[in-house]
């Protein structure tokens, strides 16, 4: 029972927020309906949807909406214990065995990391359904702030098999997008979410 509760700890609120954020934005709702209809057909019933689930789950827009909800609505506490003495993080040194506790909340809202749109119209504090999409021939799209120097180089422009649709990526925000924690203690349920 406890395992099933933990399994739903993120997915249920994120589905709820995804629905709310989609329903209050008529243009986004129309886009989502179009994406679902293009995959499952306009007359698909709830019982028929299972056969279309792999394509729905890999749809770039739906993935971006879910990832954006995790970014903006979810904060994870990460605990670590250094196994070496004088373990350094930034300007701080920690002795071996002391617990380090941090939150993903700030990192997932860091303006120096995240793309806020070409005219800064999509604040890191607000939901933006397309934040995780990279459009063909648009070097300013994608989750990472354009021009930001990072050792994790994301795609400059993404293309799907046909070459005309956006792709979903988290490449340019590796290390800052950590909705499931990380390391050996990363959430084992992340593959089910």
Question: Model-found features: residue ranges?
Answer:
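Cytochrome P450 heme-iron axial ligand motif
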Residues: 7, 166, 172-193
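Conserved cytochrome P450 K-helix/beta-meander segment immediately N-terminal to the heme-binding cysteine loop
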Residues: 102-167, 192
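Generic, well-ordered alpha-helical scaffold segments in large soluble proteins
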Residues: 18-25, 35-39, 65-68, 72, ...
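Conserved cytochrome P450 K-helix E-x-x-R motif and the immediately C-terminal K′/meander segment
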Residues: 42-91, 101-112, 167-168
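Central I-helix of cytochrome P450 enzymes
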Residues: 1-35, 189
